[in-house]
């Protein structure tokens, strides 16, 4: 649709770059393969009763929905004019001029004029990743006298995304173009549908 702010940003924002978590594509494919295997077991090569098959179908629907919402969908769209964030049940678009600061500790969190925005596609490093990060990885990202945290390392999703964002923010003043209007769209229907499948999966689990 032409009035879709995210799509309009993708088409008109300039030099679009879509960021996803490392391994998101692999985990998405593996998740769907697992669900397909369960579906085959339940309905093609199965001796389960009809009620058990219905219960398995509810569980498969919940798992498939989870793979899509939590792994496949989350992404960050970087453009010259602004940023678009797709979280499991929301889509946010804003101009770089609306960004005040970036935090990378747990997930990439954008401190904006409209409030904090957390990006599911860019999580911070785990404890094991903290141990693998070498101080040399952070030298090129040193910003003046400010201390650089492990979460800012390009080896973490949050650090890599923040690095791209800072480059785009610095370049925004050089780019002429329309001001990107802030838009926060909550996908309540998807959230309700997900809650229903979760409840059905829970009931199905106890009926197996």
Feature-to-residue mapping (PLM):
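Single-pass alpha-helical transmembrane signal-anchor segments
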Residues: 35-37, 55-70, 197-203
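Interfacial loop-to-helix junctions that mark the boundaries of transmembrane helices
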Residues: 48-52
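N-terminal membrane-targeting/pre-transmembrane regions
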Residues: 1-47, 163-208
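Short leucine-rich amphipathic alpha-helices used at interfaces
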Residues: 54-55, 70, 76, 120
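Conserved beta-hairpin
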Residues: 63-96, 100-104
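Acidic, Ser/Thr-rich low-complexity segments on the non-lumenal side of membrane proteins
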Residues: 94-125
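A membrane-cytosol interface segment of integral membrane proteins
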Residues: 116-180
